[in-house]
């Protein structure tokens, strides 16, 4: 499983900055793709704490890999072989009102919604599945190289992570690479980028096996903010080592921000606070 492979890597790295020996992503070379390096890499990112606004129930059987808010419900992608699903979840109860299961051979990963379609990645199978948003009926699939971790959209393109410091921008019609973003903070790589969410023109990314979310400028790749969620979930509520923070959802209409984790018993609506507030 992903958590066992990367725990030792994580323990040997500085929190958030990552290390140069993270999981390797096969190199892609296409005539159309370009690469964006963080020209703002020396900018000192703003630091944020949090305030809990509300607590919502969450299924402790949901190994959360992707979370999105739309039309008053959560869309959630879960992982683990034999347990991976795509769900529509009632936020008041935490129960799935509709779901589809992936074949046992697939380890589900991040999800995002673009128009009337939902895109779901898989970890190592090199497959992305496309579903009708209303029915959850699978309507297509794409193949890609390397691993799939997180995915989000700016409403036009798709952005995917693979556990390295890179975010790949993809054409939603073909899944082909349009460009690659290298994420940097103070000039150093930020590895282990996991679940992604597009918020206010930025990419927000969970940093796997940490309590931190980094806010990324999608043009330069520079980290412009760090959200520290240490203490959000009580240690006593975590049953396993890999019950880590993973899952960011945002309601642009109300600016409500939601976060959760793998097998957590709650989804938290939070507000950010600046350090010192």
Which residues does each PLM region occupy?
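C-terminal motif of bacterial Sec signal peptides marking the signal peptidase cleavage site
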Residues: 15-18
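Bacterial signal peptide processing site
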Residues: 20-23
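A short helix->beta-strand "capping" segment at the edge of beta-propeller domains
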Residues: 39-61, 91-96
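Surface loop/turn motifs at the tips and blade-to-blade linkers of beta-strand repeat domains
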Residues: 55-60, 99-104, 140-146, 181-188, ...
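Conserved beta-strand positions in repeat-built beta-propeller and related beta-rich domains
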Residues: 76-80, 118-125, 158-164, 205-209, ...
